[in-house]
Amino acid sequence: MKTFQLRTLSVFLSALGAFSYSSVAQAQLMFSQYVDGSSNKKGLEIYNPDGITINLADYEIQQFNNGGTAKTVAFRLQGSLASKQKFLVGRSELQTELGSKVNQVAALSFNGDDAVVLVYKGTPVDRFGRIGERPAAGWGTAVSSLGNSFKRIETENPALSIDATAAFDLDHSWSAWTNRNDFSNLSGSTTQPPVETVSCSSSDTAIADLAAATQEQTYTVRGVITADYRYANGFSGFYVQTPDTKARANVSNAIFVYISNSSAVKGGQVGDEVILRGRLTSYQNQLQIDQLQHDIQTCNSNMANQVQPISLELPFASLTGGSTNSPQRYQGMLVKLPQTLTVSENYNYGRYGELSLSLGRLYIPTNLYPALSPEAKALAQKNLLSKIIFDDGYNNQNRTPWLPSNFSAANTLRSGYQLKNAEGILEYRFNGWRVQPVLGRNQPEVLTQPNPRQSVLTKNANHIRVASFNVLNYDNGATGFPTERGATTQAEFDKQHRKIVSALKAIDADVYGLMEIANNGYGPDSAIAHLTKALGSDWKYVVPENLDRLGGDAIAVAIIYNSKRVKPLNKPVVLDLGDKNRTTLAQSFQAVRGNKTFTVIPNHLKSKSCSGVDASSTDADQKDGQGCWNPTRVKAVDQIVQWLAKNPTQVQKQNALLVGDMNSYAKEEPILSFEKANYKVLLNDTKVGQGTQAYSYVFGVASDANGNGGAGNLDHAIADAALYPKVVRTFAWHINADEPTLLDYNEEYKTDEQKALFYGEDAYRSSDHDPVIVDLDLNGKDSSHPDDDKKNGIFDFLSELMNWLSQLFKRN
């Protein structure tokens, strides 16, 4: 056993270059304080107990995360440290707090269970923590190393070397600060590292060579400032790029220069050719120069035309590597997007100012193809290469959007709109490739024609209209505000209520299947009663027999109907689908005109969120695009199919129409299970639906790293074989999925001006899901009849034409 331990230690020390300790002549530097403040205010204070000045360039700090034995952070110290003096290394957040007390900025990322080691010429001489160990509760028994800052008890370090894999005794070597954020006892060295002067005649390293250069070293760089983000809430820096005549092919010729807000460094503006010297490092997987110690020198102030934007076209050939059409090839450079690109997602537009752009609308792969099929995999890969984020050039949140000009609830930016002539700086930030606009350059043109807001298609008076509507946690606050899942205040709820009522009235359905309505009973103060009353005296809601509420969740499904157009037939029937899927409800109706029957069954299956899932179960995410809880949703579908086979409402002709948020895209296993049982999935049907263009929800274009984001329909209308021939058409009314989230009823994070500017008492962004609408001709010939196909086609064409003309005249 001893032999094994010695051999292990020998291998470890060899890996650090510890072949000889003879070069260690003085008392060693040591960690004197370990700083783990909140909000990333992290640092390490280093003390020189020796009687002579120490060259810090001989020392390196290494970090080993999460019990690993391979270093995750490593950087050399800079300058010198006089006898009995201290040197403070810290993150930029600590420098913002302490200013010049921080002698060297470094990307420290320890969390109390990560080891940090001080290394002298390859030999470990001090440490905090233990390499190869990740204690669940941190090191220490009296006070845990997690979430605390510490001061060293010892004041000398006689060790020639240490074993950083040996047990770590926090209790006897370190004392915890009373307040982890009290930095008053930190004192960096007053002896600053020597600053090498830089002038326009100084030699420099080509920017193109920096990608292969050693990081944590200083370099002199020359280039033209193409974009300057040193303004309020900007990115605290600027981009420099090599002039086109000196640029190198197939490699980036630009780099970001970071200058913290607390820095006194100044100089340079867009169009200047400058020279500067600083440390090469990486932040968020993007190279940058930081720690500038002198002002930026301008060598030529008329160089703006020497850097022209490079055309960046989608799709990329790859997202990595230096191919001629990979984003890495253009990183940091001034680019233009010559293609007219579609806004495929605006989910983060209100919060972060981000728009996802792509070649046409991107679709969820499993909305078009079965999970793990070659087609689904190919589409996911295509999606990854066909998108880019267009940002707003700011680093703060909840700004008023800048596109289009004078953005408001009436002047929105929908998914499906297009941007033309966009340009800016291509960069990698927040785990995504994006283009940052440049102040003073051309603003892109917003094209609204590809996907304008449209009125709902007019209903034929002889048809029955059934609609599915997810009402986004509609809760009237019967027991007060804030509600469990819905509005926080009465004012918010009033806004939500007006928008949803506006949408319901515009749709003009005869029956609605609702999802996400508060499960607070059926009395006069209930959410369902409150909503139904707002539609008028003709409207009623279905009350399950002998039930105070439907299932045990905070939200439920419900049915409301126009009593002058349809009347309930027999009693409603309930199916309990267990504690994961919401309880479902079935009610048969008879049309007042023609007396034909049909049955409406609203459903809301288990979400794709992985919250609460057992990671070892089949309900966990199988990385097939279907998310978590897929078997649970399939099981629910099987239960529903078996239940409906027994005709639970006991009518002569069931004509079942299932509607709702199935939390499953059109080609995922739950929906395919319906098809196997001879049900027809209407919205995706090529005859009566919208085929491959169907969607009711947009999600994950920017955030999904596997290409599974895009448009698709979680919301469905599914007919049994008997009802399908009576379906005239099925469509999603795109009032929600394409609209920015900041137009909804929520008031959080909005100024008073924004609250007024972003809100409209209309149907748009009344929810996050689009309503799905089904028109039924219960009295006519089956829609599958060829003659009916012609009639319905003419009717649809005329209806669409009238709708288009009305929108045209409104715009004019």
Please provide the spans of the model-predicted regions.
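Composition-driven, intrinsically disordered low-complexity tracts enriched in small residues
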Residues: 784-812
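Divalent cation-coordinating acidic motifs and surrounding scaffolds
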Residues: 82, 94-95, 131-144, 157-160, ...
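N-terminal signal peptide c-region/cleavage motif recognized by signal peptidases
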Residues: 20-22
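A structural motif detector for short, solvent-exposed N-terminal "entry" segments of globular domains
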Residues: 25-66, 110-111, 196-235
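Intrinsically disordered, low-complexity Pro/Gly/Ser/Thr-rich segments with frequent PxxP/GP/PP motifs
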Residues: 71-96
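Bacterial N-terminal signal peptides that target proteins for export
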Residues: 1-11
